[in-house]
Amino acid sequence: MNIVVEFFVVTFKVLWAFVLAAARWLVRPKEKSVAGQVCLITGAGSGLGRLFALEFARRRALLVLWDINTQSNEETAGMVRHIYRDLEAADAAALQAGNGEEEILPHCNLQVFTYTCDVGKRENVYLTAERVRKEVGEVSVLVNNAGVVSGHHLLECPDELIERTMMVNCHAHFWTTKAFLPTMLEINHGHIVTVASSLGLFSTAGVEDYCASKFGVVGFHESLSHELKAAEKDGIKTTLVCPYLVDTGMFRGCRIRKEIEPFLPPLKPDYCVKQAMKAILTDQPMICTPRLMYIVTFMKSILPFEAVVCMYRFLGADKCMYPFIAQRKQATNNNEAKNGI
């Protein structure tokens, strides 16, 4: 194609992409079904991972739950089984009422499988993934959610904690994706969800390791998405989830300026996950919660650095992590004193 003609074609496609994006904001697309599909969630034992598991269970997905904590993972599985029992009871009642067997059969055999896995260890990921393939089947939806935070200033953070943060928050996404993507490519079907953070789009002081890991995983996700497009594997969808501070206890004590906080409070975990689920089930490539984060990211990209610093100071975002770090340090000192260290 002549380069001039191609230029106009590309220009039209870019403008059309804006039109489609605007349409998505005004009229939300119909949500796809994940009923009967194998959905694997890392970090499913608590926080957002547990809530993702419950949401996928309500949509009748077959769940595979990974967590390093066996007990909390089993607790999540118990909640999922309770949802499954309610769904099966509703199906049985509908069948008895004569609403049509064809609506019931596709949703039978709802199951949840639990695996204790440290996603920060490559071999553990690959071995557990092989067990999943043998015992459950191939994964259709992969939700990379597991995450950790050290809670130390850079010069006070032990090297092993920095490495741990990078392994769990970033490297694990490489390993889980390498484990399950090949089959998705073969059948041109699947969905990879990356739960990152707004701190993967812009940073703040005191959490260098966490920000680096989240920036890294955002880059991984974007490159993977481009690779799938280049390979014309349009049946494999990707969704990047970048929430603002979520009130899960992970960053307990983190505070912005008190006058601003009523307008930008920590997100409720339920709200965060429900918004993410809407994005996943409509194949939305990326979601920032709240939407203000889109504006913050855009302004950070165009403003001079000193202007960004001024904004951070006004919002109290420049040192928002310091109370959280102080609490972590105090808790560590208390544990050491309690254990006689």
From Swiss-Prot:
It is found in: Microsome membrane; Endoplasmic reticulum membrane. The active site is at Y210. It comes from the Eukaryota. Substrate binds at S197. One of its GO terms (biological process) is retinol metabolic process. GO terms for cellular component: cytoplasm; endoplasmic reticulum membrane; lipid droplet; membrane. Detected in retina, kidney, liver, small intestine, placenta, lung, heart and skeletal muscle. Pathway: Cofactor metabolism; retinol metabolism. The chain crosses the membrane at residues 3-23. This is Retinol dehydrogenase 10.
